[in-house]
UniProtKB/Swiss-Prot annotation:
Domain LRRCT: 123-161
Pfam family, one: LRR_9
Comp. bias regions, Basic and acidic residues: 188-202, 273-283, 417-431
InterPro entries registered for this protein in UniProt: CS_DNAAF11_C, Leu-rich_rpt, LRR_dom_sf
Residue ranges that the Swiss-Prot or TrEMBL entry lists as coiled coil: 153-205
Residue span, CS domain: 305-402
Protein name per the record: Dynein axonemal assembly factor 11
Gene Ontology CC annotations of this record: apical cytoplasm; cytoplasm; cytosol; dynein axonemal particle; extracellular region; motile cilium
């Protein structure tokens, strides 16, 4: 059964940014609430309050709601109108389909001078003779009763016959009170019988529906061992019989005729709640546990797993002789939730308990590996040096001999060299060479070119160089 809690009110106050002290409208319908409480202390500014389709049996703890204008208590278990004198601005009251049999309790609403609309249809008092005339005369401020407007002539006629109508209402109330007392006794007797039957079932069988004895044997005999394989079959049969009994009990409950009383409503709700709990318990039993993720098979094979569903890239850096793993970890995730385990043949990363595992093509050195995380993107970069050292051609002494032999081979068989060559010949590029587009030497003006100077001959001492005379070609 539900209760009014602060969390419940706050969840239904999303339209007010979950602020409850300034709340003006609140809807708590279909919450299986049995008692009105805390609302008058937490939400004093309420103007509209919806409490229909609950199990409220008494109007209480609403006297401090001075600003309340509309109160909806339809489809509840209310038997008397009371404790509404403090709701000074109450304009509309809905008590449709309740169990109000004391029609004289409407006199408590005479203090609510602003009350204009009242709904009492579906209550036992609405079947009383003279019901409408009594309410119209008792509540002079009413304008509408059960959705029908009260005219002035109707009120005058009801006022003329008020004495006889009031006496008639009192007699019908007494008869109803006697009938209700019998109904309560009958409901109490049925409840005690059901409790006794349940206690007998629990005492006759175990907590799980099986029979038990106090006889214990230290070592079972051979015949008993032969009977053990048949135990699951008997358990399954007992389970099936229990399910069939539950189905029969459920059908019997719904087909059983019952009176429309607050006790019958409570009984129906308890039965539905019991069924719901049994269904939840059965679903939990049937729910299978998730099998553990297999990372390494029994024969030692490492599997590739990406349960975290992260993007990644694996690169083989031949220049630095290492393998680089770039894992796209969530940007705002805390680094403490990441665990990295580098092994010679695989790398494993646990991201929030979910494994990411990759098998490596070559062995790496775990002790020299490093893991770094980017502060901007959040990516995790794992560098794993390979076990084998990088081999370079310039570090060995017999390189010259080999180069000569290879050069001679290349000269003898140039076609073979051309076929086996991995790199593209630079002379066969289809793109033009940008560096040779402008040829400075060819287009340089002649006057800028350096002119050769004729040095005077040492043989002719009288030679004088005239710069105006052009040189002989």
């Amino acid at each position: 059964m539900g209760r009014i809690t602060e969390d419940l009110i706050r969840r239904n106050a999303e339209h007010n940014d979950c602020v409850i002290f300034s709340l003006e409208e609140l809807s708590l319908h279909q919450q299986e609430i049995e008692r009105l409480e805390h609302i008058d202390k937490w939400c004093r500014d309420l103007k509209i309050l919806y409490l229909q389709n609950n199990l409220i049996g008494k109007i209480e703890n609403v006297s401090k709601l001075k600003k309340l204008e509309y109160l909806n208590l339809a489809l509840n278990n209310i038997e008397r109108i009371e404790n509404l004198e403090g709701c000074e601005w109450l304009t509309k009251l809905d008590l449709t389909v309740n169990f109000i049999g004391e029609l004289s309790s409407v006199k408590t609403l005479t203090h609510n001078i602003h009350l204009k609309e009242l709904f009492l249809m579906g209550n036992p008092c609405a079947d009383f003779d003279g019901y409408r005339q009594f309410v119209v005369v008792t509540l002079q401020q009413l304008k509408w009763l059960d959705g029908k407007e009260i005219e002035r002539s109707e009120r005058i006629q009801a006022l003329q016959n008020y004495t006889s109508v009031e006496q008639q209402i009192r007699e019908q109330e007494k008869a109803y009170c006697l009938r209700r007392a019998k109904e309560k006794e009958e409901a109490q007797r049925k409840l005690e019988e059901e409790n006794e039957s349940e206690d007998k079932k629990k005492s006759s069988t175990g907590f799980d529906g099986h029979w038990y004895t106090d006889i214990h044997t230290a070592c079972p005999s051979a015949t008993e061992n032969q009977d053990y394989p048949q135990v699951p079959e008997t358990q399954e049969e007992q389970h099936n019989t229990k399910e069939s009994d539950d189905i029969e009990d459920d059908l019997a409950f719904w087909n059983k005729p019952s009176l429309f009383t607050p006790e019958s409503r409570l009984e129906t709700l308890r039965h539905m709640e019991k069924q719901r709990k049994a269904q939840d318990k059965l679903s939990e039993k049937k729910k299978k546990a998730k099998p553990p993720r297999t990372l390494i098979t029994e024969d030692g094979k490492v599997l590739n797993v990406n349960e975290a569903k992260l993007d990644f890239s694996l690169k083989d850096d031949e220049k630095h002789n290492q393998i680089i793993l770039d894992l796209a970890v969530y940007r705002y995730m805390d680094t403490s939730l990441i665990e990295v385990d580098v092994q010679p043949t695989y790398v494993r990363v646990m991201v929030k308990g979910k494994p990411f595992q990759l098998a490596l093509s070559t062995e790496v050195q775990p002790d020299r590996s490093s893991a770094k995380r980017s502060q901007t993107t959040g990516h995790l970069l794992i560098c794993m040096p390979k076990v084998g050292e990088m081999i370079t051609g310039g570090q060995r002494t017999p390189t010259s001999v080999k180069t000569t032999s290879t050069s001679s081979r290349e000269q003898t068989n140039p076609r073979k060299k051309q076929i086996e060559r991995l790199e593209v010949d630079p002379s066969k590029h289809s793109c033009p060479d940008v560096s040779t587009i402008v040829q400075e030497k060819r287009h340089r003006p002649k006057r800028m070119e350096s002119q050769p100077r004729d040095e005077p001959s040492e043989e002719d001492p009288d030679f004088e160089d005239n710069p105006e005379v052009p040189p002989l070609i």
